[in-house]
């Protein structure tokens, strides 16, 4: 193997375990011809939704075993729906108890996502399309779209025009329409008013809603979902895709035997959660307009849902053909060639043939493989070539792998003493130059904190070497994220059972009710109140919470559910900033430096948040060195959570560390 071949093969890194947010990314490796019957059914459902402005078609259930391509399929659906002038929303159903809160949060998140091929978000697109329908003056339309300063007069003129176009929708949905315009404004105060409205919260300041023509009384989440759907329906069809049902059901420990879902000895908590999920799925069609609901899950999950709700759910959903194996040698070859061609081009390498070193004749055996199994088998061969420093042509695939390995990570390259010194110097230089005030400002936290936290979590994973392979970090969130980062640990690949550590920064310059709104959004997105112990939420804040009754109640519920508030100091921000730049500059030997120096040990808030990680793993890797806990903004120590079952069943959370004195409240 020469140097050019070695470098080219090293670029062939497959990630066969996508996370839900990958649905929003471009699809550079998509190959036409995969799951054609299912895509055809979904697009037919979208056409049906588009043709009926006052109702929604039957929902669709897309079933496939893990690795069959459900997440990739949702990405294809998202792309094609948006190309047909429709809207797409992805609901990560992590908590059946807050079904409508979760659907609403997903719709708001989806509205803040950019439309492919433009810098315009789905929200901006919706407001632009609505503006084109109404007869309001151009100045009012531009203000509502966020292009110019929003005023009450402009908003009133827009609603008058909407009423002329569709009086019923304008009368029913006017408050939500006004909140959408406020959320598109460049003024953060306007956005705070909208955010609190969408959380069904009380007014932050008496009379602030009346100043924009809105009633003071909070509007329930289900009604806001209906409003959003009706407004969207005025301009085009929508798809609401529901994912992560398998992860939720896996917490019930009945995935291995769906018959238990109908058993008389199922616990009341299990039965209640399943009933709430089924009720929400059934009501979604009645609540929405021109909206196709797509439920993506493994077959066992659908069996469990159907058995819980008798025949009622099945009456409102139709099953698509199941996602199958590849069943086509040409399609299998195209899947690999598409990936290899892009990577080889990036490396400046011209292979002997597009699928090199996998012989075209090897794909004759690919019919029995799922797309993920094919990637796993070929990745195994590539790793063996690199390990032996010898290129061997792969001429046969053999049998599909029965066990799924973790997504591969490049082995650490031992850094020389000179390289270690160079990295040490670069790290020190970047720490010194870091911005330690901007990331926690109210106006910039949503933009600055996600990449910083992602860098810290990614470095933490890389420091663990092989023990980090079970972990993943969610891709960058939307521009208006409820969470700033999420670390996932997969406990069971088959059922997709996972543990999540979620993070959200809430700057000290947020006034009390704005901070409260962000706390509530983060709790919904993290599914903190599931009671499973598998969902953890850490709010990063250096100042004490407001002492208002509403905030005290919310913080108390947050803490009782296991949530913690952690301080972030200047040194934490310096380390995160340095790691972000170094990972962007990454070379092959950076992981060697990370594994040796382990800079995330200096992140006090992260060491505290992840103190219980090794209780969930069988191969925990090196134990973290003791560190002082991050300062907490609450004056009193956090209560220690109730004891959990033993690690074999469900690990007990680590005891809360002592907390430092709090900064005074704003």
Functional labels for PLM-detected ranges:
Residues 55-238, 415-455, 461-472:
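P-loop NTPase nucleotide-binding core
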Residues 66-69, 246-254, 268-269, 300-303, ...:
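Short acidic, S/G/P-rich loop/turn micro-motifs used as interaction or catalytic elements
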């Amino acid at each position: 193997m020469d140097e050019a071949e070695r470098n080219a093969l090293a670029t062939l890194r497959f990630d066969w375990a996508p996370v839900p947010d990958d649905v929003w990314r471009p699809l550079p490796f998509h190959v036409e011809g995969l799951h054609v019957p299912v895509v055809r059914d979904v697009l037919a459902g979208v056409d049906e939704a588009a043709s009926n402005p006052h109702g929604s078609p039957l929902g669709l259930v897309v079933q496939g075993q893990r690795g069959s391509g459900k997440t990739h399929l949702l990405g294809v659906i998202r792309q094609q729906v948006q190309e047909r002038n429709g809207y797409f929303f992805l609901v990560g159903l992590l908590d059946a108890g807050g079904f409508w809160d979760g659907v609403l949060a997903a719709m708001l998140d989806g509205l803040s996502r950019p439309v492919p091929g433009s810098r315009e978000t789905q929200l901006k697109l919706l407001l632009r399309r609505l503006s084109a329908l109404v007869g309001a003056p151009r100045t009012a339309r531009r203000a509502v779209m966020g292009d110019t300063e929003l005023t009450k007069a402009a908003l009133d003129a827009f609603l008058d025009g909407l009423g002329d176009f569709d009086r019923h929708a304008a009368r029913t949905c006017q408050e939500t329409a006004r909140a959408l315009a406020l959320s598109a404004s460049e003024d953060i105060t306007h956005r705070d008013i909208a955010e609190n409205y969408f959380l069904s919260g009380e007014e932050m300041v008496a009379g602030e809603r009346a100043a924009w023509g809105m009633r003071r009384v909070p509007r329930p989440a289900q009604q806001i979902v209906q409003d959003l759907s009706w407004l969207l329906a005025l301009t085009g069809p929508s798809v609401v895709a529901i994912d992560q049902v398998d992860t939720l059901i896996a917490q019930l420990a009945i995935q291995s035997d769906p018959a238990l879902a109908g058993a008389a000895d199922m616990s009341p908590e299990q039965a209640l959660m399943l009933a709430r999920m089924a009720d929400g799925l059934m009501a979604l069609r009645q609540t929405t307009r021109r909206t196709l609901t797509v439920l993506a899950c493994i077959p066992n999950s659908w069996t469990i849902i159907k058995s819980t709700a008798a025949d009622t759910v099945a009456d409102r959903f139709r099953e698509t053909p199941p996602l199958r194996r590849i069943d086509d040698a040409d399609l299998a070859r195209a899947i690999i060639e598409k990936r290899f061609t892009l990577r080889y081009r990036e490396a400046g390498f011209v292979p002997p043939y597009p699928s090199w070193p996998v012989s075209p004749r090897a794909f004759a055996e690919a019919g029995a493989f799922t797309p993920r199994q094919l990637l796993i088998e070929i990745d195994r061969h590539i790793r063996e070539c690199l390990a032996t420093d010898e290129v061997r042509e792969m001429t046969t695939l053999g049998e599909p792998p029965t066990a799924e390995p973790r997504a591969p990570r490049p082995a650490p390259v031992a850094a020389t003493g000179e390289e270690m010194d160079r990295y040490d110097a670069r790290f020190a230089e970047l720490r010194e130059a870091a911005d330690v005030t901007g990331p926690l400002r109210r106006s910039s936290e949503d933009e600055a904190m996600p990449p910083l936290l992602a860098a810290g979590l990614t470095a933490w994973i890389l420091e663990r070497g092989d023990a980090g392979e079970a972990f993943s970090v969610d891709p960058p969130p939307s521009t208006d994220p409820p969470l700033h980062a999420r670390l996932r640990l997969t406990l069971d690949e088959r059922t997709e059972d996972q543990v999540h550590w979620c993070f959200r920064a809430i700057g000290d310059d947020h006034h009390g009710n704005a901070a409260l709104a962000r706390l509530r959004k983060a709790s919904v997105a993290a599914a903190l109140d599931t009671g499973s112990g598998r969902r953890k939420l850490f709010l990063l804040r250096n100042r004490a919470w407001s002492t208002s009754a509403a905030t005290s109640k919310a913080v108390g519920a947050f803490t009782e559910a296991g949530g913690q508030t952690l301080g972030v100091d200047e040194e934490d921000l310096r380390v995160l900033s340095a790691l972000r730049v170094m990972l962007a500059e990454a070379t092959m030997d950076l992981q060697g430096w990370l594994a040796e120096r382990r800079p995330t040990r200096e992140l006090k808030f992260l060491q505290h948040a992840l103190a219980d990680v090794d209780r969930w793993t069988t191969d925990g890797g090196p134990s973290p060195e003791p560190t002082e806990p991050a300062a907490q903004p609450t004056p009193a120590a956090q209560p220690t959570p109730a004891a959990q079952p033993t690690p074999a069943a469900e690990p007990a959370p680590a005891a809360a560390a002592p907390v430092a004195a709090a900064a005074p409240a704003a």
